[in-house]
């Protein structure tokens, strides 16, 4: 006999499982400026993440 399972939507928190669209929770919109500024910010964030990963790897070795 297989264990009884619930549909995924019922097991997720309310904000992921199918809550009404207008719950009053709003995500702030961050203006990135021009396309070049947004690209620079993205590159900086990627470089920061890679540097952190490299540092963690070095610490664990």
Swiss-Prot record:
One of its GO terms (biological process) is lens development in camera-type eye. It comes from the Eukaryota. InterPro entries: LEP503 (IPR029194). It holds the Pfam family LEP503. One of its GO terms (molecular function) is DNA binding. Restricted to lens epithelial cells. May play a role in lens epithelial cell differentiation. This is Lens epithelial cell protein LEP503. It comes from Homo sapiens. The lineage of its organism: Eukaryota, Metazoa, Chordata, Craniata, Vertebrata.
